[in-house]
Each structure stands twice: as C-alpha cells, then as structure tokens.
Amino acid sequence: MQDWVIIDTETTGLSAPIYAVEIAGQRMRGLEPIGQPFHAFLNHQVDIPPAAQRVHGYSRNFLNLNGSAPLVAHREFMGYVGNALISAYNLPYDYDKVLVPEWRRLGIEPPLPRGFCMLRLTKKLFGSSPANDFKLQTLREHFRLPERDAHSALGDVQTVVDLLRVVLLPQLQKTGLSKPGP
C-alpha cells in the first residue's frame, strides 16, 4: 500500500504573493497515521498582514523567533514527503496556490504526483453539507470531533485525519468504497 501525506499550510493571506508561514503533514498508510507528523514555521522576512495574524496568530516577531529559513524548511518537508502523494483538505489552495509558487520562488522542483482533495471528496460524499458549510472547523464541531488547535497547520492536519477516519470512512463504506487513499 502506497503512503500518502495529508498536508496543511498557514499563510500570509489569500492574495499573491502568498508565503507559507507554517507547514504541517501527517504520513498515512491506508487510513492509519504512521510516524510523527511534520511541522515547521517559516520565516520569509515579510510582513504578516493583520488579517492573517488574526486567523492564525503568527506575527513577524513570532516567526523571527521560531521560524526556519524557507529553503531549509521546504527541503525538510520534501524529505518527509518523499515520493508519497500529497493530499490536503483544500488541495487547490494549499498545493497549487501556496506551495507550488513558493517552491518555484525557491528554485525547488514541485513533486509529482499530487494526491486528492479532501474537501472535494467530502462534497462528493455528502452532496449538501451536513452542517451549514464545508469549512473544516464547522464539520469538526458538527461531527463532535476532538478540538485541535484550529487555524494552525498541525491542528488542521490532525482534524483532517479525524474527519477521514470517523466521518468519511463510514460514508465511503456506504457507497461500497472503503479506501479513499491511493
């Protein structure tokens, strides 16, 4: 069974250029997390807009004290991912809009292949939202999943693992499928 990695990022915002200020990942084998998660703060030496700070709480001062050089953090992340598929709750954002442009700025070749989008899978399985919307934290509250550190990359990765194992797997089994991973 091929390993895959659930990833998440926290960023400087939604408008380009977008810089990752935190990256997290959890290696999976089937539906089981294996090993320790990956986690890194990145210090790009750029200002963090107040709106982004309100979401994740990371200031430029915090990143100056706790962040790694982006090239170092991304190389460590690539080492963690290896040849596994990369999946995320919102893959088009985390992978296509955040990581790929950042890797190109740093001269890193984006890994292939990318995996699947958990948000898209969730929408396909449920059709309409079982909660008010498909936001990760809304679903976490609706399905009474453990409270994690919301709007931190590591907390969101852990919430996606919970959502996958507790909510999506039973839905997949109802459709006759049992393995959403590669």
Residue ranges and their predicted role:
Residues 115-132:
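Short alpha-helix plus adjacent loop in nuclease-associated cores
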Residues 1-113, 133-147, 151:
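Conserved non-catalytic scaffold segment of RNase H-like nuclease domains
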Residues 2, 142, 161-182:
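Acidic two-metal-ion nuclease catalytic site recognized across multiple nuclease folds
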Residues 9-12, 118, 159:
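Ser/Thr-centric signal marking residues that sit
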Residues 156:
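Conserved catalytic/binding loops enriched for acidic/polar residues
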